[in-house]
């Protein structure tokens, strides 16, 4: 799995646990076992998200300059910054996730997920018949 996928899963799990169908922040009412597994998975991917933010900030400092009291990447360094960030996001990592059964997935309602998020959910967080 790439770090970029872990970041996308972080965003999706956050949506599932803490937003309603209109995107408002709420703690969703989910069965204990579903919430438990998703929270365990969130613990895994949140570490990747924190490292990503740390790396992104480091790269902004390296390839940026202070402008109006805020660090921003300079125009002449923008392509290098993007390349370095993409290299980092393409880094392979290995995680063992708590997967959900089809029945458990059925308890998750009204989540606005992007197609790529759903693909990652299916690949990494759902149990297939082979897993059972």
Q: Each PLM stretch: what is its role?
A:
Residues 1-132:
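A composition-driven surface/loop motif
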């Amino acid at each position: 799995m790439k770090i970029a996928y872990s970041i996308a899963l972080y965003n999706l799990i956050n949506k599932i646990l803490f937003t309603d169908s209109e995107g408002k922040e709420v703690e969703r009412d989910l069965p204990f076992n579903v919430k438990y597994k998703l929270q365990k998975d969130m613990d895994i991917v949140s570490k990747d998200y924190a490292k990503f933010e740390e790396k992104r900030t480091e790269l902004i400092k390296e390839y940026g300059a202070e402008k109006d009291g805020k660090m921003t990447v300079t125009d002449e360094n923008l392509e290098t910054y993007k390349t370095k960030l993409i290299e980092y996001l393409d880094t392979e990592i290995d995680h063992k996730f708590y997967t959900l059964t089809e029945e458990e997935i059925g308890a998750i309602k009204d989540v606005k997920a992007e197609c790529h998020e759903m693909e990652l959910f299916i690949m990494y967080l759902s149990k297939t018949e082979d897993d059972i």
